[in-house]
Each structure stands twice: as structure tokens, then as C-alpha cells.
Amino acid sequence: MSFFNRSNTTSALGTSTAMANEKDLANDIVINSPAEDSISDIAFSPQQDFMFSASSWDGKVRIWDVQNGVPQGRAQHESSSPVLCTRWSNDGTKVASGGCDNALKLYDIASGQTQQIGMHSAPIKVLRFVQCGPSNTECIVTGSWDKTIKYWDMRQPQPVSTVMMPERVYSMDNKQSLLVVATAERHIAIINLANPTTIFKATTSPLKWQTRCVACYNEADGYAIGSVEGRCSIRYIDDGMQKKSGFSFKCHRQTNPNRAPGSNGQSLVYPVNSIAFHPLYGTFVTAGGDGTFNFWDKNQRHRLKGYPTLQASIPVCSFNRNGSVFAYALSYDWHQGHMGNRPDYPNVIRLHATTDEEVKEKKKR
């Protein structure tokens, strides 16, 4: 079913990279004013194509359904402080959230009830539902500014285990048994969830400036890092594979309108706020503070398609379970702190129907 009233077909491209224009986004579903403050996270249900949750700095998590192309708010639950992250349980029956009240909360879709199941001593920046240990037990892992990650059994209030991190946790992601944690001071901790309490490998981001986001490959053999300096790095767990296939590249940079004609003046550099991998094709998207998003093919090392600058930064983006829908927020990303925000700053969630032209790897002829 296509709720965007257009087919998901493949069309040929004359080159390996293409720039879109605003007409390519004309059929996007737009949710205006989805929250009273900036959107911090978006997560799709792993069991439904058109249902997702969005957390916000206004202290709420809202659940949306766009099954028929008309956005409908299905539920919301509140916190006393900004909510920084949200994710769904693997069976799609519960939505977890964490934020600046330091609490891990679990919302039950069927009952509409919210329970607090855990606490940190500082804000929870990121969380994931993972399967741990030899028995692949489902639990929640949270990463906090208190320099720890904690594993939680949803049936008890105390963490199953706590792992110290070298610094405050800024980002975290997992695929299969791979968990990658990115912290302040550019530290990267790699954990094999078969042995979840041990850091399998500790390394440092090759990017020179603060890490903004991390995302794992579908194959669970590596991860991508985005930084505040408008760079992305493609990394592999295996040292030999890293030497062969790892690389870094510039992105989310704009021409400085004030530079002199014909000069080689500096570009305007924006943070890479969010990275997401297509669940079927393994290509990926970066979204940035410049208000653009780009689809990339890491294996062929080229951009599949770039999009025009929109009216606000993009703090977060996400694919649905089969990659047919790409959601992104236009919202303040807090990169410039409190002083950079303003009352009239846009606050929008948009849903874009992907085409193979945009997101599928193009084989070499």
C-alpha cells in the first residue's frame, strides 16, 4: 500500500549521484506542530509500517499512525522534563523513553499505562531494545550522561548490569549482537552482546571534533559516525576490513554567501545530526544542521541522491521496518545552545516515500 499516492518504482539515473529539488518532496506527508518544542527522536514500530513514536523537548512522547496517509495521533505520555529518546519493543507492544528526568519509562500500547522501570544519576540520552547473552534475552540498554550504560529487565526496577563508559554517552546503536557506544571526547566502545558487560574493543573516532551520532550496519560488522564538523566516517570492527574499506568524507557543508567571488573561502560547516541505514538495501542517509538529507552508498563510495536545503535543521531521521518510508524532523537541533533557538523556529515531522532510485545500491556495469 502506498499512502503517498505514488508508486515505489525504479527509474534510471544518468549519473551515480543526483540532486533533487523541492518537487521531489511535494508528496511528503507533513505533520505540522507535532510537539510544543523540538523533536529529539523518531522511532518506527518494528511490527507496523506506518506507526511511529516521536519524543520531544516538551516532555512528551507521541505515537502517530499514518496508515491511510492522514496523520492521526494515537497516544501520548508525559514526563516532567525533556524526553531525549524513544524506541519500540521488538513485539511492538511497548514504547520506552528516557530523558532529562533520568528515568527510563515504559508505555504499554494496549493498556495506555506508563511505568518507570529504571533510573540513572543523569539524563538518559539514548536507548535500545537488545537481545543479550547466550539465551538472547530481550532487555533495554540505556546510555546516560552519568558515563554508564545500563541493562534493564523490564520486570524489575534494578539494572541487570552496569558498564562504565569513559565519558558521557552521546549516541548508541545496535544491530544483531553488535552494540556501539559513542561518548564525549570522541571515545567509541564496542560491545558484543553475547558478553554484554565487557567492552570488546575501545577506540577513538577518527574525526577531529565531537561525535554527534553513530549507526550500525545491517551486517553488524561496522558502523558510521557523524560529527559536528560536517564529516562522516565509515568504520569496520575487523582491522583488516577497516584498512581495506574504511574511509571518511565531508558532508552537510554549504557555500559561504559572504566569501569573495573567485576566492577559496571557507564553507559553512554543519553537524551531522542523524544517520540511518536502509533495513533492506544497507545504503544510508545522513541528516544535518544545514536542513538537508542525503542518501549514500558506502560500498561504492558515492552519494545516491541529495536534497535541497529546507527551512530548519534536521535533528533526527528514521526508516520504517522495510525502508519504504523515511521520516525526518525539521526542528531546532540545539547545536547553538539556548541562544540559537527562537519562538518562530519551525517544528515539523515529514514522511517521505522512498524509491529505489533514491536508496538502492547501483551496481557497477
UniProtKB/Swiss-Prot annotation:
GO terms for molecular function: RNA binding; ubiquitin binding. It is a peripheral membrane protein. PANTHER family: MRNA EXPORT FACTOR AND BUB3. Pfam families: WD40 (PF00400). GO terms for biological process: nuclear pore localization; nucleocytoplasmic transport; poly(A)+ mRNA export from nucleus; post-transcriptional tethering of RNA polymerase II gene DNA at nuclear periphery; protein transport; regulation of mRNA export from nucleus in response to heat stress; RNA export from nucleus; septin cytoskeleton organization. This is mRNA export factor GLE2. InterPro entries: G-protein_beta_WD-40_rep, WD40/YVTN_repeat-like_dom_sf, WD40_repeat_dom_sf, WD40_rpt. WD repeats lie at residues 34-74, 78-117, 119-162, 267-306. Keywords: Membrane, mRNA transport, Nuclear pore complex, Nucleus, Protein transport, Repeat, Translocation, Transport, WD repeat. It comes from Saccharomyces cerevisiae (strain ATCC 204508 / S288c). Functions as a component of the nuclear pore complex (NPC). NPC components, collectively referred to as nucleoporins (NUPs), can play the role of both NPC structural components and of docking or interaction partners for transiently associated nuclear transport factors. It is specifically important for nuclear mRNA export.
